[in-house]
Amino acid sequence: MQESTANKVAANATSSFTEHLQRDRPELLPFNRSGQGSATAAAPLQVPHATTIVAMSYNGGVLMAGDRRATMGNVIASRHIEKVFPADRYSVLGIAGTAGIAIDLTRLFQVELEHYEKIEGTLLSLEGKANRLGAMIRGNLPLAMQGLAVVPLFAGFDTSAGVGRLFSYDVTGGRYEEHEHHTVGSGSVFARGALKKLWRPNLSAEEAVAVAIEALFDAADDDSATGGPDTVRKLWPVVYTVDSTGTRRVAEPQLAAASQHVIEARTIAGREA
């Protein structure tokens, strides 16, 4: 009996955890829970939304940063939300859109990559990770059509090519490789303007952190759904770097120092806008 069960499990084994859930427990998928896919919302749901994410390449890797504010309509739902997460040892994921679904999707993606490594005995390629994330977003399309969209930003270090790479997505799961830098979320247009002026090739990791802080400051200046560094509450953006050694979360003292430098520079300049 035990051997028969083991053989059955082996026969049904798949390197995709999402595929396994879709086949055996579809109700556990964040985009396939009972009643969600067929519901017709009469009015927009008031749920927390994550806002602005910025990412850029630097000399030897990639960086991703996100502000800490979540909004629900015209209300600040949270000042502490984290929107950038390590997907595995060599990649990070930033979320914009419906916060609850985005966080569930992030956890599923983390398990997906861990499951693949356990089954196959090797890491999935960065290209493969980007493709699998696109397939997950495509699965959320019915909810996106109801206004519960998730639009992530994915970045990682390609160990085979020895470079950092950035990928953006649309709500249909379309995957697009970006170069130099990219932004998503409600404040993205303002953050992108800052990146166009401040980014340059071969930034150091420390310089990239400073550029990301500047971009989030600019986004928070003009977008009420984006929260800039909060010096009163000592709340700083979540920032990750990824290089040949893996992912690293930038320490809060470094973020505090970079934020203070931006504030002092703008105070001296007497900037009003």
Swiss-Prot record:
GO MF assignments: threonine-type endopeptidase activity
UniProt keyword list: Autocatalytic cleavage, Cytoplasm, Hydrolase, Protease, Proteasome, Threonine protease, Zymogen
Positions of the propeptide segment: 1-50
Region Disordered, annotated ranges: 1-23
One record GO biological process: modification-dependent protein catabolic process
Active site per UniProt: T51 (nucleophile)
One GO location term (cellular component): cytoplasm
Family as reported in the entry's similarity comment: Belongs to the peptidase T1B family.
Name of the featured protein: Proteasome subunit beta
Organism: Pseudarthrobacter chlorophenolicus (strain ATCC 700700 / DSM 12829 / CIP 107037 / JCM 12360 / KCTC 9906 / NCIMB 13794 / A6) (Arthrobacter chlorophenolicus)
Lineage: Bacteria, Bacillati, Actinomycetota, Actinomycetes, Micrococcales
